[in-house]
């Protein structure tokens, strides 16, 4: 019974002094919050706002994406039908006897010497 009375008295004392500490903590928290709002207000007055920074980052990302998606047109290799697309390097688009009569289109071949 004596131990229960001791624990109850400790509980009452802890709750009483705990509330006093909470009041001090709440005052400190209010000061911290006010200081943070002051810093945020000063940050809003900065020459480059957060929105401008995000727009700058977005524009650079869009430029990189546009560069990545734009490819050079590919050329056609040897013995490939060449109707609308160009042939690579030293190849010429000519009608040949081998494939041309079957597919009825010119092919990329090495130009004949002569």
Curated annotation (Swiss-Prot):
Signal peptide extent: 1-20
Disulfide bonds: 75-88, 82-93, 87-108
The entry's keywords: Cleavage on pair of basic residues, Disulfide bond, Ion channel impairing toxin, Knottin, Secreted, Signal, Toxin
Tissue occurrence: Expressed by the venom gland.
Domain comment in the entry: The presence of a 'disulfide through disulfide knot' structurally defines this protein as a knottin.
Name used for this protein in its record: U17-barytoxin-Tl1d
Pfam families: Toxin_22
Source lineage: Eukaryota, Metazoa, Ecdysozoa, Arthropoda, Chelicerata
InterPro entries xref list: Toxin_22 (IPR012627)
GO cellular component terms listed in the entry, alphabetical order: extracellular region
GO molecular-function terms, A-Z: sodium channel inhibitor activity; toxin activity
Nucleotide-binding recorded as keyword: no
Purpose: Ion channel inhibitor.
Protein family according to the UniProt entry: Belongs to the neurotoxin 14 (magi-1) family. 03 (ICK-30-40) subfamily.
Propeptide feature ranges: 21-74
Compartment annotation: Secreted
């Amino acid at each position: 019974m004596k131990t229960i009375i001791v624990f109850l008295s400790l509980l009452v004392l802890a709750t009483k002094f705990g509330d006093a500490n909470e009041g001090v903590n709440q005052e400190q928290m209010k000061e911290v919050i006010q200081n943070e709002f002051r810093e945020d207000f000063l940050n809003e007055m900065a020459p480059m706002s957060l929105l401008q920074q995000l727009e700058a980052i977005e524009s650079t990302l869009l430029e990189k994406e546009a560069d990545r998606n734009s490819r050079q047109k590919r050329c056609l290799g040897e013995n490939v039908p060449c109707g609308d697309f160009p042939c690579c390097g030293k190849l010429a688009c000519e009608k040949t006897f081998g494939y041309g009569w079957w597919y009825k289109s010119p092919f990329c071949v090495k130009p004949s010497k002569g």
